Amino acid sequence: MFTLRVVLFVVLLCISNFLVAADPWLTIEGNDGLGKGQHIVFVTGEEYYRSEEGMSMFAKILSQHHGFKCTVLYSIDPNTGTINANRNDNIPGLAALREADLMVLFARFRQLPDSEMRHIVDYVNAGKPVVGIRNTTHAFRYPPNSSSPYKAWDFQSKDWPGGFGQQILGDTWIAHFGKFQKEATLAHVNATQRGHLVLRGVADTIFCHTDVNSVERLTSNDVVLFTGQVLSGLNATDPPVTDQRKDTRMPFAWFKTYTAPSGKQGRSFTTTAGASLDWINEDLRRLMVNAMLDLTGHTQKIPTKTMVDFVGDYEPKPTGALSDEVWTAAKLTPQSFGIKSK
């Protein structure tokens, strides 16, 4: 009987540990730093740019180097419990936004259940700060016959022109200005904003593997920090294109003061960079972290050269959509992106 009790205790303990480890999101407690006592929630869900890698990497940097508690949410296949960015209808853990000091959103064409979507809507309606990355300009898509109360957040909305992207970030999806996976980006600092505190320690140019996106609807009130130039190839040494696009640079990184549907105002920061390979660039990482420090109230304390070293290994995967079979075989869980014990 004693042996049986021991066996049952061990089994229950293993089950308990499994359940604790099986949360469909990743939470990393913060060390000491400017962000001590604050909470950043990263919301991922897009098929091309490995947002699950890049945002998990930033969560490690912000928590370990700067003190923020960080939670990363993922698109989860409820049938397997693993990450599958093709599942556009399930991002568990969005209730964490209730206590978030900053939402970092990296999503594309999500159609979330109203019970999940309302957490994003409530967060924005509170006028809280938002960071939008790459295809977050078209984060949400609803079918024409949708009865959702959040249908107006669709990237093609006519009722709330351009939906979330245009109204909160500054623009919705238009087109690739550079050729997708064929032409990289060289971003140039806006000389009139060189003294902006978010640009502390950031170089005048930033190379990105991703192509330039068209951005055409920013206003004179939006603050553009960098503009993107189309390169003729995918290497930093490739020259700019020489066709009709040669003299056009698109907004690459900017701040906006938005007005939410509630009437409250808030601030957002957006960049059209975002592939996991892009974050290899230290200056781009510093720009992002500085922007997050700014949006969480630490503008005057942004360091001369903000620490953005990787925490652990960072081995980004190439850009491109993956099949459901590939996602299932990968068996990635939120804990796959946690801080590994040495």
Regions found by a protein language model. Name each.
Residues M1-L4:
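N-terminal secretory signal peptides that target proteins for export/translocation
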Residues W25, S63, K69, N88, ...:
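Catalytic beta-strand/loop cores that center a nucleophilic Ser/Cys/Thr
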Residues Q38:
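Nucleotide donor/acceptor-binding cores
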Residues A22-G35, G54, Q64-H65, S232-K342:
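Extracellular ligand-binding/catalytic regions of CAZymes and related secreted enzymes
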